[in-house]
Amino acid sequence: MDDVAAAAHTSKTAVYRHFADRTQLYIAVCERVAQVLVGQVRVAMDGATDPQAKAAAAIAAYLRLIENDPEVYRFVVHRPLVDRTLGADLVADLVSLIGDQVADVIADQLAAAGADPAPAVPWGHGLVGMVRSAADNWIARPSGMSKDELADHLTALAWTGLSRVAARIKEDAS
């Protein structure tokens, strides 16, 4: 809490007026990050015109949030020493929420193409897991790769897989 107070340019007493302990602070930060991240990913996807652009926009939005505030990302993802009597895993909840939203977009695209939308859920969650894992590595072990380069690489991998498997499903349905 000393570090939080110092970063906020206030006293520890002022921080404790708003948060009883580090766990409550962690929960509040997670909730705010979830709100911002889900909003930014959704806006990015909604602003894209085709499925590949939607994937690229979502990946770029996620990486942009990390690049803009890597310390907040580390704080949320790597869970500081908090009281683990929490009933839920807030990071897993956030990842599931984003996975569900990506799955919804994929399902809509599959249905519009006349294909079965059933694979959308595992594909959406798989994509989110891939991006999160690559982002964790990118932030933990910087290699000089820019956010844009990483986004391009992840989009290429995701789109190659999605476009081929979607085409196969459509062929099987014919």
Question: Which functions belong to the PLM regions below?
Answer:
Residues 35-38, 85-111, 119-136, 149-163:
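Amphipathic alpha-helical packing segments from all-alpha helical-bundle domains
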Residues 74-77, 85, 170-171:
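Short, hydrophobic secondary-structure boundary micro-motifs
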Residues 7, 24-47, 53-64, 75, ...:
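Alpha-helical structural segments
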Residues 22, 116-120:
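Short glycine/proline-centered loop/turn elements that form peptide/ligand docking sites
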Residues 68-74, 107:
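Charged, amphipathic alpha-helical coiled-coil/dimerization segments
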Residues 1-24, 28:
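Helix-turn-helix
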Residues 112, 141-145:
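Transmembrane helix-loop junctions in multipass membrane proteins, especially transporters and channels
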Residues 165-174:
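C-terminal effector-binding regulatory domain of bacterial HTH transcription factors
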